[in-house]
């Protein structure tokens, strides 16, 4: 079965300013995949993964480029993919119980969005579904990363739709935020 991979992760500018930039970044990716049913059918397969930092995306500094293939999720050309890059501080905030909370909340948001968008033109529906998942991820990040004593990781920019329409596709996403800038290259293999 084909999978979606990160082919390359490049640190253009690590997060932080001043003294905060003296330490390297450890980054990880959140990915949501949801299959888009046709007609009035709402049955859908979803997947939520948390990948990294591991040895492949830790201690990243300005100009670092990591080219190890890192598997993220199953590939389905009829699915929507939304990804978010996170900078880890201390322990990873999206782990254990938090991962289950993300998965459950995203699945609820996805099912509701599928129901709301039945009958819409495909491009309009995909946009609405991607926006729903992006908003849900941002809300979850606020809870699990922004509440004192709950977490301290930092989202690098907003969640983004990853478009890989064919097995020969590659896509580059630009993640900018928290004064950091990363470029991720994704592929199907």
Language-model-detected regions and their locations in the chain:
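Short beta-strand-plus-loop segments that form exposed binding edges in beta-rich domains
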Residues: 11-17, 85-90, 176
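A composition-biased, non-transmembrane "mature-region" signal
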Residues: 2, 14-17, 32, 36, ...
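Eukaryotic beta-sheet cores, primarily in C2 and C2-like/PH beta-sandwich modules
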Residues: 29, 60-120, 141-148
